[in-house]
């Protein structure tokens, strides 16, 4: 049975992803992790939860080992509005989360899913019916 860790589970996508994956893999096989105490408390009503700062690779790895994780869903991201105001912080969080997820997925032979952030296309990219070969020029 797959054991899935969703990091950033308290975000917009994570809050929908947790119950969806629970339906397919069972309640006890989906672990929801988030940095924010309020989201961890809220999610603990409906899921197995862990508080996690994904930039702390040792804490991240401890959870992967504790639950014998087969798949990691990295939903952690600092979104465009904040990222454009503080690009260094966006880089630290978004790339740090990705790098730690890649490192642990490789070391523990887990599957990894990590989506592209919302601002990946940039301001000058067509917003409707965006062609597959569009040049991406993000602002962040």
Please provide the spans of the model-predicted regions:
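A hydrophobic alpha-helix adjacent to the NAD(P)-binding/active-site core of NAD(P)-dependent oxidoreductases
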Residues: 49, 90-91, 138
């Amino acid at each position: 049975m797959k054991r899935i860790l969703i990091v950033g589970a308290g975000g917009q996508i994570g809050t929908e992803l947790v119950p969806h994956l629970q339906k397919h893999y069972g309640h006890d096989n989906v672990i929801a992790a988030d940095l924010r105490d309020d989201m961890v408390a809220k999610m603990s009503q409906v899921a197995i939860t862990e508080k996690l700062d994904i930039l702390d690779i040792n804490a991240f790895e401890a959870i992967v080992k504790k639950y014998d994780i087969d798949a990691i869903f990295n939903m952690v991201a600092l979104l465009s509005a904040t990222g454009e105001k503080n690009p260094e912080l966006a880089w630290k969080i978004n790339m740090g989360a990705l790098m730690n997820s890649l490192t642990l997925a490789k070391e523990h032979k887990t599957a990894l899913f990590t989506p592209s952030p919302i601002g990946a296309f940039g301001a000058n990219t067509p917003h409707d019916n965006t062609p597959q070969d569009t040049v991406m020029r993000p602002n962040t």
